[in-house]
C-alpha cells in the first residue's frame, strides 16, 4: 500500500502554503446585505446583552435594520417629492414616520430634531361650509314685490 509520487499533507481545512490567495468575503456580502454584520456583531458582544451570541443573530438584526431604514427612506423620499424638493430633510422624515400607522406606533416616543409637527387644525376652528351657501342664496333670489295698491 505504498504510493509512488508526492505525499499529500492534511491542512485541516486550510489551503496549503503557496496556494493562490483569494479575496476575503464579508459576512454582509455573504448575506446579501448593505448593513455591516461584523460591526453589529461587535456591538452586540460589547453591549453584553447576553452571555453568548448565536451566529445568525447579527445577520438577522442587520437585515431588520436595513429593511426599516429602506422603508423610512422610501416614505421620506415620497414626502420630499410631494414638497417638490430633491433632498430629504428632517421634516420629510417626520412627515413620513408620523403619517405611516405602523412606523408611527414603533417610533411614537422618538423626537426628531428640526422635524416640526404634523399639520393639524381642529375641525371646530375650520370655517363652516354651510355659512357661505345662505349668502349666495340671498343674492340669487329675486326681490319680493310689495302688493299693488288700487
Swiss-Prot record:
One of its GO terms (molecular function) is DNA binding. One of its GO terms (biological process) is heterochromatin organization. The modification Phosphoserine is found at residue 146. Not ubiquitinated. Keywords: Chromosome, DNA-binding, Nucleosome core, Nucleus, Phosphoprotein. One of its GO terms (cellular component) is heterochromatin. Its main location: nucleus. A motif (SPKK motif) lies at residues 146-149. Signal peptide: none annotated. Strong expression through-out the roots and leaves. Also found in meristems and dividing cells. It holds the Pfam family Histone. Contains one SPKK motif which may interact with the minor groove of A/T-rich DNA sites. Phosphorylation of this motif may regulate DNA binding. This motif is reiterated in both termini of histone H1 and in the N-terminus of sea urchin histones H2B, but its presence in the C-terminus seems to be unique to plant H2A. The nucleosome is a histone octamer containing two molecules each of H2A, H2B, H3 and H4 assembled in one H3-H4 heterotetramer and two H2A-H2B heterodimers. The octamer wraps approximately 147 bp of DNA. Core component of nucleosome. Nucleosomes wrap and compact DNA into chromatin, limiting DNA accessibility to the cellular machineries which require DNA as a template. Histones thereby play a central role in transcription regulation, DNA repair, DNA replication and chromosomal stability. DNA accessibility is regulated via a complex set of post-translational modifications of histones, also called histone code, and nucleosome remodeling. PANTHER family: HISTONE H2A (PTHR23430). This is Probable histone H2A.7.
